[in-house]
Each structure stands twice: as C-alpha cells, then as structure tokens.
C-alpha cells in the first residue's frame, strides 16, 4: 500500500507463524482478556505449549510481580522466540490467507484470517462500537512492540457477501485442513491454508467492494496494533506502506454467522434501599411481575430477568421510559443502565464502579443465582442479547455502545496464527 490513494477494505495475505499440526490443540488458548492470571496458571499446568505463555507471560514469573512489569513483556517475547526456535511454531514460506472455522453446539462460523490496514482502522473504514481504556491499550501496545508481532487476532465482521462465502465453502470442500481439533469446552476448531495465488487475488478483490469492516471483539487489541504501526512509521520515516507493521492480524466473519450471547449484570447492594423500597422504585420505569419460570431468561427485547432473595422477576420497560428513535438509548443494556442501575442504584459508571460486575451468558443463569445466593451480590439481571444488526447500525452511525454490551461465542483461540511485524 502506498501513501497515496487506496481502495476500501484492503486485506492482504501474510506469512503466518503458526504451530506445527501435532501441537495445534495444545498451543491454542483462550484470549488473554478472558482469564485472569490465577486462572491462566491453572489452565497451563502440564502444558508447556499453551499460548498463554506468550499472551499472559506473568504465569511464568513470580506471582507477586505486576502483570504490567517490564519483565512480563520481555518474558512474552522470549517465550515466543523459544517456541519458534524449538519448532513448536513454523513460518510459512509464502504469503497466504487462511480459513478458520469454529463449530459450537452444531453452529459453524467460517472466518478468513488476513492482515488488515492500520490506515483503515484510523480512517474508520474499520468501524468501532466501543470506547477503549488507555491503560488496557498501553498493555497491548507494549506486548505487540516487545513481541514484534500481533499474537491475538482481531475479531472483525462484514455484511455478508455471497461471493466470499462461496469461495470459502468450495475451498473447504476441496482441500484438507491444516488443523482440526476439539477443545476442552467442546468447540471444534478447523483451519485451512489458502495458498493459490489466483484464489487469493479473487478474495482480495472481493473485499475491495465491501465498504466497511466492523470490530466485533478486540477493540483494545486493534487500537494497540494500529498505534504500534504508527510508532514504527515514526521510527522509519521512509516507510513505503507495504511493511508488515502497516497491517495487523484479523479474522473476518460474515455477520449472519455470528452469535451474540447475553451479557448479564450482578450488583452488590441496593444502594441502602430495602427490597420493598427497591421494588417500588423500579416500578417508575418497569412493569414488575413474578416470573413464571425459574431461572427467567428474557425471550424478547425490552424485557429483563431479575433475581433477588431467591426469587425471579420479569421486568418489562415502560414505553415512555426511553427514546425508541435513539439507537444507543434504545438498547436493552442502555435501558437497564440508565433507568435502573444509574437512576435507582446510583451506579453511574459501570466501567469503574466496583458495585457492579458482568457475567457472560456462557456461564448460564444458574451462575447468577449462585452469586446472589452466596451473599456476595444482592441482585442479578438477565438480559436479551444485543443483535448483530444493532451493532452494525450503531457502528455505522459513529456511536458507541455502553460497556459490556456484547458477548460473542465461541471465542477465537490465540496462537493458531501469529503475524510478525518484521
């Protein structure tokens, strides 16, 4: 890519650093931000090949050490180099595209593993729907910079294009995969390498007709990758735009294959209110009734489950409560935040208020009951999932969603594809 004119949705092949086939299942790891350090230490017991040794390298150091200590990033870089040296990882000789298919509970999604442009991140061709936090960006900037690589893929989506689907489908049918394994959570992972130049050209050209890509998951990773690329440009003022640091590792999925799960909330107290006072206050904004099933999972938008004192309630928002014409304010996560968590419980900033926590739908509503019954939390709220159409519309409008609006399953595994910035 040169500094002048360019086309939209530029994707390009790359020489992946990736595990040898027989080690792929052991290498593949959940994303760094899904596990805390203690959980990661447990996961890697007996597995020296887990990519968590790169993505969360503090697990190989003194537990008293901060995960943001310089030594953690240095250890990550050392561990990646060691994997390459020991030939746990190889690097493909020629640039290629890759297909990455995940199947969970009978539902498959097939993504194209590519490099995308930091310029398109910067000019909003790659659209966002979340704000990022500086300290989280800084963590991944340091990680990418020291490792000299994008180690975790950015999960991108695009409005479905039949031509792309057809090419991916036919390639899968006609070629043997490079990886196939079922992870411990039952998700099946299969990958193919697309090395045929004519097919690569066809796919690259197909994306030039796609006006936008959208970040589904990985706002901090993408922001960090783009910033490292800009840092490298400053260090290399004669850059051409074709160097690897101008691009970052992404997996592109058609929007209609993705599954957003519920992202639920638990709160530690009722802001000094008795249960009776709390129930009375929320009737300003919601119709409240005892649920006829337990646990209660909302089956349509604008309805919520609430678990308190061993009882489930169904909440239905009153129409006059919110502006139905406002894309963001009309989201279920916004309605709960604006009119219950903020107005009644005075939890105004869910990012920083320790009185609220978030529970991904993968953990089930029984987890909400367990947390409240333990006494650690006073109430739990189950939500109807945000839709893909809402995500795309909000990103198109240049708006941002409230924190913790979307929980995607299945999670992409890290370590199957690494993009070197060299």
Regions found by a protein language model. Name each.
Residues 2-422:
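Surface-exposed, charge/polar-rich loops and edge strands
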């Amino acid at each position: 890519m040169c500094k002048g004119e360019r086309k939209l949705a530029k994707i390009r092949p790359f020489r992946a650093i990736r595990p040898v086939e027989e080690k792929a299942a052991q290498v593949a790891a959940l994303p760094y931000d899904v596990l805390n350090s203690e959980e990661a230490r447990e996961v890697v017991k007996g597995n020296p090949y887990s990519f968590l040794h790169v993505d969360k390298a503090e697990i190989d150091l003194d537990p008293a050490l901060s995960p943001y200590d310089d030594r953690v990033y240095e250890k990550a870089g050392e561990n990646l180099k060691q994997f390459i040296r020991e030939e746990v990882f190889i690097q493909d000789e020629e640039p290629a595209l890759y297909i990455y298919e995940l199947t969970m509970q009978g539902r498959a999604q097939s993504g194209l593993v590519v490099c995308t442009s930091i310029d398109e991140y910067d000019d909003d061709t790659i659209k966002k729907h979340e704000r990022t936090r500086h300290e989280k960006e800084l963590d991944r900037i340091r990680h990418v910079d020291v490792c000299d690589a994008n180690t975790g893929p950015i999960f991108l989506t695009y409005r479905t294009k039949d031509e792309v689907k057809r090419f991916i489908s036919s390639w899968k049918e006609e070629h043997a995969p490079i990886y196939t394994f079922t992870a411990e959570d039952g998700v099946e992972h299969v990958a193919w390498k697309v090395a045929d130049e004519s097919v690569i050209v066809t796919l690259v050209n197909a994306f030039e007709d796609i006006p936008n890509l959208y970040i589904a998951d990985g706002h901090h990773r993408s922001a960090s990758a783009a910033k490292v690329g800009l840092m490298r440009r400053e260090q290399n003022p004669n850059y051409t735009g074709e160097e690897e640091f101008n691009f970052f590792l992404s997996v592109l999925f058609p929007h209609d294959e993705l599954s957003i799960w519920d992202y639920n909330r638990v709160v530690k107290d009722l802001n000094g209110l008795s249960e009776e006072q709390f129930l009375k206050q929320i009737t300003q904004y919601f119709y409240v009734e005892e649920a006829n099933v337990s646990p209660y999972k909302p089956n349509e938008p604008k309805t919520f489950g609430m678990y308190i004192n061993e009882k489930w309630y169904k909440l239905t928002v009153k129409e006059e409560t919110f502006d139905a014409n406002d894309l963001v304010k009309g989201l279920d996560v916004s309605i709960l935040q604006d009119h219950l968590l903020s107005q009644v419980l005075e939890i105004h900033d869910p990012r920083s208020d320790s009185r609220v926590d978030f529970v991904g739908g993968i953990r089930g509503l029984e987890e909400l009951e367990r947390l409240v019954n333990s006494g650690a939390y006073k109430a739990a709220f189950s939500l109807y999932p945000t839709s893909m159409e809402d995500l795309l519309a909000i990103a198109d409008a240049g708006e941002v969603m409230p924190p913790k609006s979307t929980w995607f399953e299945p999670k992409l595994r890290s370590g199957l594809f690494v993009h070197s910035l060299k």
